[in-house]
């Protein structure tokens, strides 16, 4: 039986929960050069695939290992790192994207695991019956991680119905992001698929 996990979350992951305009200001003044000078529209597109912090509910659960593969550990930028990867589907505006949910982790100063990277990376897009491929980006393009910028997410909850609804049936973990002004309107849906059992 799997055990429950505890993670801290780096501020670079939490930033994607903010407005695109605020994210742009922070990125333009930040230490990650690749994000400087991006337009608000580019930030909005990136927000769609990075603003998925609710995945932490699945990561913390006993079900985590039924959804995520773990990679081997490696050293980069002076820190021990590893990834967790799951298959997922992101649906928005009539478009369905099949891809991977990537979780990048490093060992924090007190030995705890810190999430520094969280995103959905599309591998295929399906729209009106058409399927087209897309390429994978670099798996880990974060050179430096400011370790003091992580926070403990235990106890953090959104007010019911404000941002999303999460459900799990054992085979999939589903997050429906809703319009805060009209919670009956689903803006996008992210579904994490269970790893198939080999018999």
Curated annotation (Swiss-Prot):
Entry-linked Pfam families: DUF1609 (PF07753)
Source organism superkingdom: Eukaryota
Family under the similarity heading: Belongs to the UPF0329 family.
Protein name (record): UPF0329 protein ECU01_0120/ECU01_1490/ECU08_0050
Organism: Encephalitozoon cuniculi (strain GB-M1)
Classification of source organism: Eukaryota, Fungi, Fungi incertae sedis, Microsporidia, Unikaryonidae
């Amino acid at each position: 039986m799997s055990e429950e996990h505890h993670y801290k979350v780096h501020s670079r992951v939490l930033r994607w929960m903010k407005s695109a305009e605020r994210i742009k200001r922070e990125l333009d003044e930040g230490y990650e050069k690749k994000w400087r000078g991006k337009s608000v529209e580019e930030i909005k597109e990136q927000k769609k695939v990075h603003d998925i912090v609710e995945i932490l509910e699945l990561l913390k659960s006993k079900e985590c290992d039924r959804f995520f593969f773990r990679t081997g550990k490696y050293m980069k930028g002076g820190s021990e790192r590893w990834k967790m990867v799951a298959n997922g589907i992101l649906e928005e505006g009539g478009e369905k994207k099949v891809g991977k949910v990537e979780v990048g982790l490093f060992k924090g100063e007190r030995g705890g695991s810190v999430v520094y990277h969280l995103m959905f990376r599309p591998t295929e897009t399906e729209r009106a019956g058409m399927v087209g491929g897309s390429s994978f980006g670099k798996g880990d393009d974060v050179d430096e991680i400011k370790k003091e910028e992580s926070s403990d997410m235990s106890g953090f909850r959104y007010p019911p119905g404000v941002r999303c609804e999460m459900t799990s049936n054992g085979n999939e973990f589903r997050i429906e992001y809703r319009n805060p002004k009209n919670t009956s309107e689903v803006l996008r849906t992210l579904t994490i698929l269970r790893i198939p059992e080999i018999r």
